[in-house]
Structures are given as structure tokens and as C-alpha cells.
């Protein structure tokens, strides 16, 4: 039995005797032959093949005895059991490094002959470092004989046949699956087509029934819309007047607030300018004081340096004076000694004079000694006089230095006082500057808050103006829709009921007829819809059709007139489109502005009809209620 451990393609550097080096891709396979009986041992088989050249075959069988000799020859440190895994690890490193320009691990196949015919070749695993090419392992492979090549080709052929059989079996299975799926899809398609035919027939029947039912519902809804139209108009007029008055009051209040805020802002700006000017003055004073302080500090430093130099000179003079005083003391001691010696010599002289008669021979020598001593005494007295003169000069210099030091101290003391006063003034100015800066920051915060309030009020005012503009646009659009609906209803009634009585009734349309206007506007500040009013803001004017004129307070006066000829469209009789307002304008929304008293009155009017409206409908003929 054999166990395949490694089978991969690697780039190999091929070397021969008389040819250049080249790189080729060679398949390296490592197999472990397991023994059939416990007596035999395991063998490791290394095989080199080329997928493009089927006759390229090199084999190497390594037994445990061969590995021991290989271990001794190449200095290996592993056993036979761990050798295959280490060999595979080296090959994996060669695979990782083979795509690089300068691979660290390289697989070499070298032959001693000029071509790879039937001579053995060496397979080397070489590591390239900065010092040398290090060969980790070198295996001597033998070329395969004819029988080996035939066995290898036979094994390749058998493996190819097995793969072919497996692929054929997979192909049969896939064909069977696809045919089964195709049959199932065809069956489902036929079933779905039958269901589709049934659904089409049902749909045609349902559409016919729904169209007839829809026509009946449309006629009923038209009648209800005409009833609610006249009822809602009066409520909308009242609501519009209330909303306009509230808008007028709110705009006046906002304008007064804006004027107050502007005056406060101007006062704050004036205060800010004044504080800025005071800050500039204080800063200028501060800079001047700082400059004076710097100058005084520099003067103090220079005076301190001069004082230190004078102190050092004074110390040197005192040291010299002490040295001279010690020398004078020594000389005085010597003079005293000499005086004592002179006294002694006088005594000796007296004794000698007394002994003159007895010692005449030694008189000359004694006189010589006396003359010598007198000369030494004279020299000592002269030196003493010179030392006294030097001491007097040093004392005079010391007095002059002490006077200079006193003058310097008298100059530096007032300068230090001035410096202390300037530093105190500077500290006071800094404290005042900090206080003014704090007051300025408070004023700036107050100004920022007032600016924010002003911006908020201006923003609210702009938004209210935008809402008023949108309300105006909605009113104009609704009036256009109502005009178009009325014209289409007129055309339908004229086409369906064209009789003399109907003509008389269509001629007697009231001119002061009003139209319902409802709207829900989603905005950040919900404001009521400004609808059409009577008087200067009347909804309806002369006979050509309903016209709307809306003049809010915050917008420039503009008249939005809508003529029925410009926006009239022919009624779609085939589809029977509903005429009047869309149902979305009658729906209740959570974010809408509630119309005061509208919904309860609508509910009551649905339950109990008003006698005034019915009487008016019966008394006055109208184009909306023919016949």
C-alpha cells in the first residue's frame, strides 16, 4: 500500500553541463510505501514528472538504511519518521518563494551530462542568504527505465479513465435531473395557463359588475358632494375671517417685538463699542507701563551689575589692606625687636665704654658692628615710612569707594521704589483690565442671547410668511379645481338634460355662490388656512365665473384671478371621472389644523338635513341641481 504525502507543481532551476540554466515547472510527488508484513520496513518514494513531457520521469526510493547513510553524509539532525514532513516543509517554502524576483529558497535539478537522457541527476534545496548558497538537502534521482515509464503511463491512463467514468456518470445524472425538471415545468405551465384563462373570464365579469356599481356610487357621491359644498362654504368663510384677524394680531405683536429687540441690539452695540474703546485705551496704557517697567528693570539690572563689580573691587581692596596691615604689624614687631636690640647694644656700649680701658683691642670690631646695625636701622625706618604711605593711599581709596557705593545705593533705592510703584500700578491696571474683560464677556453673552432671540423671531416671522404664501397658493389651486369641476358639471348637465327648463335654470345661476376650501398643511408652526373673505377679499365677483382675490398683511397685494375658459377641460364621459374635490381633502389628519365647529356640524348635517338649504334648493333653480 502507498500513501500519497505530497503532489504539487513547482518551479525548478534546471542545470546541465553544456546548456544554460532554465526554469521549468515539474511535478514533485512524495509517497510512503507501507509494508504489507511487519518484517518489511517503510520506504519513501520521491518522483519527478513533467505534465507536458510524459517521458520525463525520475525516481528515488529511500529506505531507512539509505536514510542513515544520507544522514551521515549530509549531517541531518532528524529521524526517518520526521524526514518526509521536513522535506515537504522545505518544498512548501520553495512554493512560497518561487514568485519573487530573488527567492530565498530554490529548488535545483542538476545533471552532469549535457542533456537529461539516462544519467542520474541531483535535486537540491538551496537557501540563499547574504553570505552563501546553503544547500539544505541534496537527493540523487535516477531516471526511469522503460518499464518504469510504462508503469507510470499506465497509472496515468487508468486515473484518466476513472475521471472520465466519473464525469460520464455526473453527466447522466444532470441530464436526468434536467429532463425531470423540464417535464415538471411544462406541467406547471399548462396548469398555470388554464388558471390564467379562468381568472381572465372572472376578471371580465367582475369588471362589468364593478363598472355598473361604480357608476351608481358616483352619482350618489356627486349628490352628497353638492350638499356638503353649500354647507361647508359658510363655515369656511367664518373660519377664514377668524384666522385672518388672529394672523393680523400675531404679525403686529411680532413686529413690535422685532422693533424692541432692534433697539436693544443697538444699545448693546453702542455699549460694546464703548467698552472696546476703553479696552483699547487700557491696552495702550498697559503697553506703555510695561515698557517703562522693562526699562526700569534693565536699569536696576545694570545698577546691580555695577554694584556687584564695586563690591568685588571693595573686597579686593579690603583684602589688600588686610595684607598690608599684617605686613605693617610684622614690620612694627621687627622695629620693636630692633629697638630692644638697640637698647641692648647701648647697654653693651656703655658696658664696653666702661670696659674701654680693659677692652681696647675689641673696640674697632664693636664699632663696625654698630655701624652695620645703624645702617640696618635706617633701612628699616625707610621701609616703614614707605609702608605708612601705602597704607594711607589704600585708606583714601577705600573711603572713595565707600562714597561711590553710598551714591549708588542712594540712586538705586528710589529707582527700586519707582519700580515697586510701577509694578503695583501695573497689577492694578491688570485687575481693572480683567474686570473690564469679564464685563465685556458678559455683555457679549447678553448680545449673543439677544441675537439668537432676534434670529429666532425673524425665523418664525419668515416661516409664518412662507406658510401664508403656501396657504395662498393652496387657495388659488382649490379655486381652480372648483372652477374646473363646476364647468365640467355644467357641460355634463347641459349635454344630458338639454331642455328649455334646464336652459332657464342654467341661466339663473346665483352669482354670489361660495366654494368650500379645506387644506391640511404640515409645517413646523401650524397656522390656519387663510381662505377667501367677503368685502375687499371676496371670493366671487362678476358673472364669468368664480374669482379669488387674497391680500394677506405680510405679502404684497396680488390678485389671483382664475377664469373658467383657461382651465376648463372636457368631461370624460366614458370613464365617468368624479367631479368635485378629491376625497383626500375630506379626510381627517392628525397633523392638520382643526376647523372650528366643522366636523360636528358635518356629522349633524348628515343625520338631520337643514330645512333652509332644502327650501333654497327648491326655490332657486341652479345648474348644480338640474330638474
Swiss-Prot record:
Q: Which residues form a coiled coil?
A: 153-473
An annotated GO cellular component of this protein is: cytoplasm
Q: Alphabetically list the UniProt keywords.
A: Cell cycle, Coiled coil, Cytoplasm, Cytoskeleton
Q: Where is this region: Disordered?
A: 187-257, 561-586
Low complexity bias spans? 229-238
Which intervals carry biased composition (Polar residues)? 202-213
The places in or outside the cell where this protein is found are: Cytoplasm, Cytoskeleton, Microtubule organizing center, Centrosome
UniProt feature, compositional bias: Basic and acidic residues: 191-201, 214-226
InterPro entries the record matches: SAS-6_N (IPR032396), SAS-6_N_sf (IPR038558), SAS6_CC (IPR041513)
Please report the stretch or stretches of sequence annotated as the PISA domain: 39-91
GO BP terms: namely:
centriole replication; centrosome duplication; embryonic cleavage; mitotic spindle organization; nuclear division; positive regulation of centriole replication; positive regulation of G1/S transition of mitotic cell cycle; positive regulation of mitotic spindle organization
| Domain comment in the entry | The 35 nM long coiled-coil domain mediates homodimerization while the globular N-terminus links the dimers at an angle of 40 degrees to form the inner ring.
Protein task: Central scaffolding component of the centrioles ensuring their 9-fold symmetry. Required for centrosome biogenesis and duplication: required both for mother-centriole-dependent centriole duplication and deuterosome-dependent centriole amplification in multiciliated cells.
Matches recorded under PANTHER family: SPINDLE ASSEMBLY ABNORMAL PROTEIN 6 HOMOLOG
State whether it acts alone or in a complex, and with which partners, per the record: Nine homodimers form a cartwheel structure with an internal diameter of 23 nM and radial spokes connecting to the microtubule triplets.
Write down what this protein is called: Spindle assembly abnormal protein 6 homolog
- Name the source organism: Danio rerio (Zebrafish)
Amino acid at each position: 500500500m502507498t500513501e500519497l504525502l505530497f503532489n504539487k507543481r513547482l518551479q525548478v532551476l534546471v542545470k546541465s553541463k553544456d546548456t544554460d540554466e532554465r526554469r521549468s515547472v515539474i511535478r514533485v510527488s512524495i509517497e510512503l510505501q507501507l509494508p504489507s508484513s511487519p518484517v518489511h520496513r517503510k520506504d519513501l518514494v520521491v518522483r519527478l514528472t513533467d505534465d507536458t513531457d510524459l517521458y520525463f520521469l525520475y525516481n528515488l526510493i529511500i529506505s531507512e538504511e539509505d536514510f542513515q547513510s544520507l544522514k551521515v553524509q549530509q549531517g541531518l539532525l532528524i529521524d526517518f519518521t520526521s524526514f518526509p514532513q521536513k522535506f515537504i516543509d522545505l518544498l512548501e517554502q520553495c512554493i512560497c518563494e518561487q514568485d519573487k524576483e530573488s527567492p530565498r529558497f530554490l529548488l535545483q535539478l542538476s545533471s552532469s551530462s549535457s542533456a537529461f537522457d539516462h544519467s542520474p541527476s541531483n535535486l537540491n534545496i538551496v537557501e540563499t542568504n547574504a553570505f552563501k548558497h546553503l544547500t539544505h538537502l541534496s537527493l540523487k534521482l535516477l531516471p526511469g527505465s522503460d518499464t518504469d515509464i510504462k508503469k507510470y503511463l499506465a497509472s496515468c491512463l487508468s486515473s484518466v479513465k476513472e475521471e472520465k467514468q466519473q464525469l460520464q456518470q455526473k453527466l447522466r445524472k444532470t441530464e436526468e435531473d434536467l429532463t425531470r425538471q423540464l417535464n415538471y415545468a411544462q406541467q406547471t405551465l399548462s396548469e398555470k395557463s388554464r388558471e390564467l384563462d379562468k381568472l381572465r373570464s372572472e376578471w371580465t365579469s367582475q369588471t362589468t359588475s364593478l363598472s355598473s356599481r361604480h357608476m351608481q356610487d358616483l352619482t350618489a357621491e356627486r349628490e352628497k358632494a353638492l350638499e356638503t359644498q353649500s354647507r361647508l362654504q359658510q363655515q369656511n368663510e367664518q373660519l377664514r375671517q377668524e384666522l385672518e384677524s388672529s394672523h393680523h394680531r400675531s404679525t403686529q405683536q411680532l413686529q413690535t417685538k422685532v422693533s424692541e429687540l432692534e433697539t436693544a441690539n443697538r444699545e448693546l452695540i453702542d455699549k460694546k463699542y464703548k467698552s472696546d474703546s476703553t479696552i483699547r485705551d487700557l491696552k495702550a496704557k498697559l503697553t506703555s507701563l510695561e515698557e517703562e517697567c522693562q526699562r526700569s528693570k534693565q536699569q536696576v539690572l545694570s545698577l546691580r551689575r555695577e554694584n556687584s563689580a564695586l563690591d568685588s573691587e571693595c573686597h579686593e581692596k579690603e583684602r589688600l589692606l588686610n595684607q598690608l596691615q599684617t605686613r605693617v604689624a610684622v614690620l612694627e614687631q621687627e622695629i620693636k625687636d630692633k629697638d630692644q636690640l638697640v637698647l641692648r647694644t647701648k647697654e653693651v656700649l656703655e658696658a664696653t665704654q666702661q670696659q674701654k680701658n680693659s677692652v681696647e683691642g675689641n673696640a674697632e670690631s664693636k664699632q663696625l658692628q654698630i655701624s652695620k646695625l645703624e645702617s640696618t636701622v635706617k633701612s628699616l625706618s625707610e621701609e616703614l615710612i614707605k609702608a605708612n604711605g601705602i597704607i594711607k593711599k589704600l585708606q583714601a581709596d577705600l573711603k572713595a569707594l565707600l562714597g561711590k557705593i553710598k551714591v549708588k545705593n542712594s540712586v538705586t533705592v528710589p529707582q527700586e521704589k519707582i519700580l515697586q510703584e510701577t509694578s503695583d500700578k501695573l497689577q492694578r491696571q491688570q485687575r481693572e483690565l480683567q474686570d473690564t474683560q469679564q464685563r465685556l464677556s458678559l455683555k457679549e453673552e447678553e448680545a449673543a442671547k439677544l441675537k439668537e432671540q432676534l434670529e429666532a423671531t425673524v425665523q418664525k416671522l419668515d416661516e409664518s410668511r412662507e406658510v401664508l404664501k403656501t396657504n395662498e397658493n393652496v387657495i388659488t389651486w382649490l379655486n381652480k379645481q372648483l372652477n374646473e369641476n363646476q364647468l365640467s358639471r355644467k357641460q355634463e348637465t347641459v349635454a344630458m338634460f338639454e331642455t328649455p327648463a334646464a336652459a332657464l335654470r342654467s341661466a339663473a345661476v346665483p352669482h354670489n355662490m361660495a366654494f368650500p376650501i379645506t387644506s391640511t398643511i404640515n409645517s413646523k408652526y401650524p397656522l390656519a388656512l387663510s381662505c377667501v373673505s367677503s368685502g375687499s377679499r371676496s371670493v366671487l365677483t362678476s358673472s364669468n365665473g368664480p374669482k379669488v382675490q387674497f391680500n394677506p398683511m405680510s405679502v404684497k397685494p396680488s390678485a389671483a384671478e382664475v377664469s373658467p375658459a383657461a382651465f376648463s377641460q372636457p368631461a370624460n364621459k366614458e370613464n365617468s371621472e368624479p367631479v368635485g374635490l378629491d376625497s383626500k381633502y375630506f379626510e381627517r389628519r392628525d397633523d392638520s389644523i382643526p376647523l372650528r365647529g366643522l366636523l360636528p356640524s358635518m356629522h349633524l348635517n348628515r343625520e338631520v338635513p337643514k330645512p333652509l338649504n332644502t327650501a333654497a334648493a327648491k326655490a332657486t333653480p341652479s345648474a348644480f341641481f338640474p330638474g
